[in-house]
Amino acid sequence: MELETSVYRPNVAVYDSPDGVEVRGRYDQVFAKILTRDALGFVAELQREFRGHVRYAMECRREVKRRYNSGAVPGFDPSTKFIRDGEWVCASVPPAVADRRVEITGPVERKMIINALNSGAKVFMADFEDALSPSWENLMRGQVNLKDAVDGSITFNDKARNKVYKLNDQVAKLFVRPRGWHLPEAHILIDGEPATGCLVDFGLYFFHNYAKFRQTQGSGFGPFFYLPKMEHSREAKIWNSVFERAEKMAGIERGSIRATVLIETLPAVFQMNEILYELRDHSVGLNCGRWDYIFSYVKTFQAHPDRLLPDRVLVGMGQHFMRSYSDLLIRTCHKRGVHAMGGMAAQIPIRDDPKANEMALDLVKKDKLREVRAGHDGTWAAHPGLIPICMDAFSHMGNNPNQIKSMKRDDASAITEEDLLQIPRGVRTLEGLRLNTRVGIQYLAAWLTGSGSVPLYNLMEDAATAEISRVQNWQWIRYGVELDGDGLGVRVSKELFGRVVEEEMERIEKEVGKDKFKRGMYKEACKMFTKQCTAAELDDFLTLAVYDHIVAHYPINASRL
C-alpha cells in the first residue's frame, strides 16, 4: 500500500473519540484509520488505569534526584538482595527471536522501515523515541507505516530516484520502541490532561497489529518491544501490568508480549535483576544503551564536582565504569536466561574518503569483536552498510543463535558498586567543548524541523548525543573546569562558552551553506541550547524542555462527519 496524503480542511472533520478523549492534532483521513474510537478507547483505558502509578514513579525519580544532589550516590538496594541472590529465570525466549545477532535501528519513517526490514539484520527496532522528533505528523505517520509493514503492504515511491521500495520475502523481526515514561503526548488529552506518550505509542500499535504480527512475525508470540529510559524496577512493574492488561484485552496468552529493556540510566544498572524479575514473563533481555548511559552519569552526578567527565569522545567502553556496566549486564542476563544485547555502532560509511572509511569500519569491527568475546548475544547498527561487519563479528558464536547457555558464566557479584561508579579518566579540551556545542546545536535544529535521526560528522546521531553534549557543557561551565590541550590553564566560563558559541555558529553556517542555514532553525536552536547549557539548574531532558516548540494544536470546535 502506498501512503496516502490528504489536505486538512479546518472546521470540517474531527476524530471519532470516546468520552473524555480529545484529539488536538491535525485531522487526516489516513490518521483516522489509526485513531479509531475503539483504539482511542483502549489508550484511554491504559491511561486511566496506570496514570497514578506513572505519577508516583516520576515523583520517586524527583526524590532520588534530590538525594543525589545532596551528596548520595546510587547503589544496590539491600531490600531486594533476595531477588539478586535468587535462582529464578525468565520465561524461555520465543524461537522467533532466539537469533538477534545484529539489530538495525531507526525512526518509524516509511522508506527507513522498508530498508531496515530488508537490510539482512535479524531485528529492526522501529523507534518512536530518541531517533524521532515527536511531532504529530511523525507519530501518526509512523503508526500508519508500521501497520502497513506488519500486514506486508508497505511500499514507498521515491519519485526523485524513480524507484519503488517494497518488502523482500525475508525480513527482519520487528521490535518497536515507544517513548519513555516521562514524555507526554500533548496532542491527545484524556480527561483534560495530556496522555502519557509511551501509552499512546504502545496502545495504538498494539491495538491495530497484535493479531497480524503474531501470525506473520511472532510464531504465536508478540508483538515485541524495546523499553527505554527506566530508572527503577517499579517502572518495569508498570510496563508488566500494561502488557498483562493488553493481553487480557486481546484475549491472548499471558507472556505473549515480549520486551527488551535498555539499561541506559545509571540508577538502572543497580536494578537489572529487579527489572528482569518484574518482567520475567515478558522479558527477552537487556541492552547496553551506552550513549544515554553516559548522559545519565553526568545528570546523576550534576552536584558532584569531583565526578567531572573528560571529553565525551574519550568515554568509551574502555573506561572501567563502562566495561563494568557491560560485564554486569551480560552476567545478569545469562543467569536469568535472556539476551544481553550490545551497544550502538553509529558510524556511517564515508563514501568520498576510502581511507577514512576503512579506519571507521575497522573501529566498528574491533568494537563488535569485543562485544561478542565479552559475551553479548547481539549488537546494534545504525546503518545497513555496517550489518555485514557486525554479522561477521558475531559469527564467532558458531552455529549458536546466542550465547545465553554457551558462554562461561561469571559471578555477577564480583562487580562492585565501586566498579560501576569509578570516575572516568581523560583530558578536557577546548575542542571537546566546541564539538559538544557544534553537534548539540545542529542536532536540535534538525529535531525542531522534524528530524530525530541526524547524520553529523560521519555518525548517525540521535537525541542521546545532544543530551550528552548539553549536560557536559553545563557541568564544565558550572564548575569552571580547567582545560587541557590547546586551552591549557583556561577555565570554562559563561564568557568563554559565549565566544565558542559565536565561532561554532559561524563554522556551522560555512559547513551547511548560507541558504540552508538561513532556511533552517539554527539560530532558534542556538538560543535554546545556550540557555540549557548556562541555566542555573539542569533540566532533566532536553527533548522535554523544548517539546512545546513542536506541538501544534488544531481547532476542536469542528462538526463531526
From Swiss-Prot:
Motif (Microbody targeting signal): 559-561
EC number: 2.3.3.9
One cellular component (GO) term of this entry: glyoxysome
Annotated keywords: Glyoxylate bypass, Glyoxysome, Peroxisome, Transferase, Tricarboxylic acid cycle
Keyword DNA-binding among UniProt keywords: no
One example of a Gene Ontology biological process annotation: tricarboxylic acid cycle
Gene Ontology MF terms: malate synthase activity
Catalytic activity, as annotated: glyoxylate + acetyl-CoA + H2O = (S)-malate + CoA + H(+)
Signal peptide: none
Pfam families named in the record: MS_C, MS_N, MS_TIM-barrel
Subcellular location: Glyoxysome
SUPFAM superfamilies, A to Z: Malate synthase G
InterPro entries referenced in this protein's UniProt entry, alphabetically: Malate_synth_C_sf, Malate_synth_sf, Malate_synthA, Malate_synthase_CS, Malate_synthase_TIM, MS_C, MS_N, MS_N_TIM-barrel_dom
Pathway: Carbohydrate metabolism; glyoxylate cycle; (S)-malate from isocitrate: step 2/2
Main localisation: other
Active site: residue positions: R177 (proton acceptor), D462 (proton donor)
UniProt key word Oxidoreductase: no
UniProt-listed PANTHER family: MALATE SYNTHASE, MALATE SYNTHASE 1-RELATED
Similarity remark: Belongs to the malate synthase family.
Protein name: Malate synthase, glyoxysomal
Origin species: Brassica napus
